[in-house]
C-alpha cells in the first residue's frame, strides 16, 4: 500500500500591528493554497489583532503565546516581562516539538521572538522579513541566527548581520494588483480621496482631514471622501461631521477590503508604515504621507522620504500638520491633475508585484535545504 506523503509544516509569526500581521498573513495564505501538501500554523497573541484576522481563515491554525512588547524602563513590568519571555519560549519549544515545522518565518513584532528563538534552539531553519528602512529590534537580533533575510528597502541591509539578504519588496495580497494595468482617470470631474491612519487609526489625521474636506465640499469642490477612522476613533470623529448623511463624505471604522478603496482613489492621505506604502504603490495611488512621529528610529518618516524622492508622494510631518497646510497641499494637487498623473506613474518604482511569490519560493526552498 502506498504511504501518504507527509505534509510540509510551516510556522508563520508576526503580530500586534497591521504592518507586521498582513505580510505574515499573505505568506500563510499563499502557502495554504496547496492544502494537500502544506499545513500552516500562525503563532501570535490571542489578545491581539492577529487572532481576529487569522481566525477568519479555517485553513490556518492559530497557536497562541502570551507575549508582548518590551517595557523600555527598568521596573517591575520589565522583570515580569522577562518571565513571560522565558515562559513563551518554552511554550514555543513545545509547539515546535509537537508539530515539527520544516521552517519558520517571522515578519516582525515582539511576539515573533520567542517562537523564532525556540526554532534556533531546536536547529530549525529561520527566515525573517522586515518592511522598513530601519529594521525593528527583533529583526536585528534574529538576523544574527536567521538563514535568510528578506527586505523591502536596500537601506535596511546595513543594520542586519545575516549574510543571506535579498531585497524582495513587501508580500502583499494579489488583490492589490488585480487589474492594476488599468490606469486611473485623473481627468474625471469627481476625485476620490481616501484617508487612512494605519490599522490603529490616527485621531490627529482624522480631525484635520474632516475639517479640511468639509470646507472644500462646502466651497463646491467635486470630491468623494472616505475616511478610515480606526475603530477606537470612529465615534469621536463622527461627532466632527456637520452633515452625517452626506453621500460624498463617508466615515468607516475599518475597511476590510482596502484594495478596492485604493484602486478607486485618486489621492490617499495616510501614515507611512512600509506595508501601507507597498499597497499604495501597488495600486498606483498618489499620496500625502503623514509619518507617525513616535515610530521607532523615526522609520516612518524615512520610509516617506524614500517615496518623496521619486515624486510619487508628498511628506508632511505631523508637527507641521495644520488645516491650512493640508488644505493648500490638497488644493494644489486638485488644481494640477498632471502632477497627480506623474505621481501615479512614479509609484511603479516601488511596486513589486512578484514579492509575495518570491518570498514564498525562498521560504519553501529554505525548508527543503
Label each region the model flagged.
Residues 6-17, 34-84, 231-233, 317-319:
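Conserved nucleotide-sugar phosphate-binding/catalytic loop shared by glycosyltransferases and other
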Residues 14-25, 203:
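A short, glycine/small-residue-rich beta-strand->loop->alpha-helix junction that serves as a flexible
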Residues 38-41, 60-61, 120-181:
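Active-site-proximal region of nucleotide-activated glycan assembly enzymes
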Residues 48, 53-58, 177-268, 301-305, ...:
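Donor-nucleotide binding loops and adjacent catalytic segments primarily
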Residues 72-103, 121:
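An amphipathic, basic-hydrophobic alpha-helix
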Residues 101-103, 263-278, 285-286:
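Acidic donor-binding loop of glycosyltransferase active sites
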Residues 339-353:
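A short, well-ordered alpha-helix in the C-terminal region of glycosyltransferases
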Residues 352-369:
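C-terminal alpha-helical cap of glycosyltransferases
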Amino acid at each position: 500500500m502506498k504511504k501518504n506523503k507527509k505534509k510540509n509544516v510551516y510556522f508563520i509569526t508576526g503580530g500586534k500591528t497591521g504592518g507586521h500581521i498582513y505580510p505574515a498573513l499573505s505568506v500563510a495564505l499563499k502557502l495554504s493554497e496547496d492544502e494537500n501538501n502544506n499545513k500552516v500554523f500562525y503563532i501570535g497573541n490571542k489578545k491581539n489583532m492577529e487572532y481576529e484576522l487569522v481566525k477568519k481563515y479555517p485553513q490556518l491554525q492559530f497557536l497562541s503565546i502570551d507575549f508582548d512588547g518590551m517595557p523600555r524602563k527598568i521596573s517591575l513590568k520589565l522583570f515580569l516581562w522577562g518571565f513571560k519571555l522565558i515562559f513563551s519560549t518554552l511554550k514555543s519549544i513545545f509547539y515546535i516539538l509537537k508539530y515539527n515545522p520544516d521552517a519558520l518565518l517571522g515578519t516582525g513584532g515582539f511576539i515573533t521572538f520567542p517562537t523564532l528563538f525556540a526554532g534556533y534552539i531546536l536547529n530549525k531553519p529561520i527566515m525573517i522579513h522586515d518592511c522598513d528602512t530601519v529594521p525593528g529590534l527583533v529583526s536585528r537580533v534574529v538576523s544574527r541566527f536567521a538563514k535568510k533575510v528578506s527586505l523591502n528597502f536596500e537601506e535596511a541591509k546595513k543594520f542586519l548581520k545575516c549574510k543571506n539578504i535579498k531585497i524582495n519588496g513587501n508580500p502583499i495580497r494579489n488583490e492589490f494588483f488585480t487589474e492594476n494595468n488599468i490606469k486611473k482617470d485623473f481627468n474625471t470631474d469627481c476625485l476620490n480621496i481616501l484617508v487612512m491612519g494605519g490599522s490603529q487609526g490616527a485621531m490627529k489625521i482624522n480631525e484635520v482631514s474632516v475639517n479640511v474636506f468639509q470646507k472644500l465640499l462646502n466651497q463646491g469642490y467635486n470630491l468623494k471622501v472616505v475616511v478610515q477612522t480606526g475603530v477606537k476613533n470612529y465615534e469621536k470623529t463622527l461627532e466632527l461631521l456637520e452633515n452625517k448623511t452626506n453621500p460624498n463624505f463617508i466615515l468607516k471604522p475599518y475597511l476590510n477590503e482596502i484594495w478596492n478603496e485604493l484602486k478607486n482613489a485618486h489621492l490617499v492621505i495616510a501614515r507611512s508604515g512600509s506595508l501601507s506604502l507597498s499597497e499604495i504603490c501597488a495600486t498606483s495611488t498618489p499620496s500625502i504621507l503623514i509619518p507617525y512621529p513616535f515610530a521607532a528610529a523615526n522609520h516612518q518618516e524615512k520610509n516617506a522620504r524614500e517615496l518623496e524622492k521619486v515624486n510619487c508622494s508628498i511628506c508632511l510631518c505631523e508637527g507641521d500638520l495644520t488645516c491650512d497646510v493640508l488644505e493648500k497641499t490638497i488644493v494644489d494637487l486638485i488644481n494640477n491633475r498632471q502632477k497627480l498623473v506623474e505621481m501615479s506613474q512614479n509609484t511603479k518604482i516601488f511596486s513589486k508585484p512578484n514579492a509575495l511569490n518570491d518570498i514564498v519560493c525562498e521560504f519553501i526552498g529554505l525548508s527543503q535545504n
